[in-house]
């Protein structure tokens, strides 16, 4: 097992090195970009914030919450996840399925990071998001795309098998990954359509063309990279592996 682990780690490092020959836009990790660049400008003092699906690992930490005097509500389908969150991070918790939750329209900001791919009814989730936001409120969403090859494989393989494979190849995913995924309507085009349907305006977007799922074997990684380059040339942003969106609920005077 030690030898296999060494080979996997070597292939991962070699795959990362090969990536350096690609233009920068193909090397920016979407989740890291969401954390470091996309979401922070929206964090201003005094907001009522909802973290949807963050559970035990909310987007905000206690220092940021305290410094900005934020009120944080955690919404998750699993009460156990909410209970494992850092003590005092949530001012309130709601155990509910975001696909069928009716909000109070009191949120200035909603953060939903790598959650909607696990929701069976994303149309319902968009309705819930619109209901949680107050007029002028914003939703910040990061999601893997249904069009990604790993997403297609995820949909084909039995849950128990893909969970074992994922955890065997990438042990760090044992915490926080491995939940069932459906990728319902999780594409840039579908998200824009759903936003319009639920009276939300797309304010900002970013599209990302990298992931690490195939980096455990360099030849496979090279083939996947060639696929990404070709797919992007033909389909543009629909070829994104992951993407971020900021959605605004129009103010009452604009409705």
Q: Where do the model's predicted regions map?
A:
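Conserved N-terminal segment of class I S-adenosyl-L-methionine
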Residues: 1-105, 109, 240-243, 251-255
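Short glycine-centered segments of the SAM/dcSAM-binding site in methyltransferase folds
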Residues: 48, 136-138
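Active-site micro-motifs of SAM-dependent methyltransferase domains
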Residues: 100, 117, 148
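Active-site acidic short loop of glycosyltransferases
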Residues: 104-107, 121, 135
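A short beta-strand submotif of the Rossmann-like class I SAM-dependent methyltransferase core
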Residues: 112-115
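S-adenosyl-L-methionine-dependent methyltransferase catalytic module, highlighting the catalytic core
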Residues: 120-128, 138-252
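Basic phosphate/pyrophosphate-binding loop/patch that engages nucleotide-derived ligands
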Residues: 131
């Amino acid at each position: 097992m030690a030898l296999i682990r060494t080979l996997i780690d070597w292939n991962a490092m070699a795959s990362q090195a090969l990536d350096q020959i690609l233009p920068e836009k193909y090397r920016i990790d979407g989740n890291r970009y969401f954390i470091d660049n996309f979401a922070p400008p929206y964090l201003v003092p005094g907001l009522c914030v909802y973290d949807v699906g963050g559970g035990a690992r909310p987007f905000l930490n206690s220092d940021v919450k305290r410094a900005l005097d934020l009120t944080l509500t955690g919404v998750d389908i699993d009460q156990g996840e909410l209970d494992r969150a850092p003590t005092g991070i949530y001012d309130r918790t709601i155990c509910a399925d975001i696909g069928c939750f009716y909000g109070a329209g009191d949120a200035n900001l909603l953060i939903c990071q790598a959650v909607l791919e696990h929701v069976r009814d994303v149309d319902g989730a968009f309705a819930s998001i619109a209901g949680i936001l107050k007029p002028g409120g914003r939703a910040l969403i990061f999601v893997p795309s249904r069009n990604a090859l790993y997403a297609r494989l995820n949909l084909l393989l039995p849950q128990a098998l893909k969970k074992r494979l994922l955890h065997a190849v990438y042990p760090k995913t044992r915490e926080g990954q491995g939940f069932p995924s459906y990728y319902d309507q999780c594409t840039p085009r579908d998200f824009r359509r759903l936003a319009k349907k639920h009276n939300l305006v797309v304010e900002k977007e970013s599209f990302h063309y990298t992931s690490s799922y195939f980096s455990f074997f360099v030849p496979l990684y090279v083939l996947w990279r060639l696929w990404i380059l070709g797919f992007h040339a033909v389909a543009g942003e629909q070829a994104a592996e992951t993407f971020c969106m900021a959605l605004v609920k129009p103010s009452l005077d604009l409705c």
